[in-house]
């Protein structure tokens, strides 16, 4: 099990769908090769992990790294409830699975766009980026991630 880290009312909630294999082994989200890249991403927008609430919807990785439709509905409910409890100022949706669960849209459709995520306590502005592991495997996607991340600094 990989539990959330951080405090309520953080500047940013970083939300993945579920832990990666390295995360489950280490008991912390965004470890392994993806960890240093996430740290660099946060530094680029003026934050560090301690400024953020970092969580995943599922505390364990599903078999095969995918969930079925029946689980997706429950994870969507958990998403909105978790965001309402965490009360972040902004939300960073990490990975195509997370975005699909949150909005039903593919990552390509929302790159460089500010999203509004409705939840039990209102709504929060969000952006989506590819998972850092994907950005390491496909560096050409880093520019699109940066286009989205710049929106988080808007109005700061």
Model-flagged regions — what are they?
Residues 1-156:
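A polyanion-binding, active-site-adjacent surface
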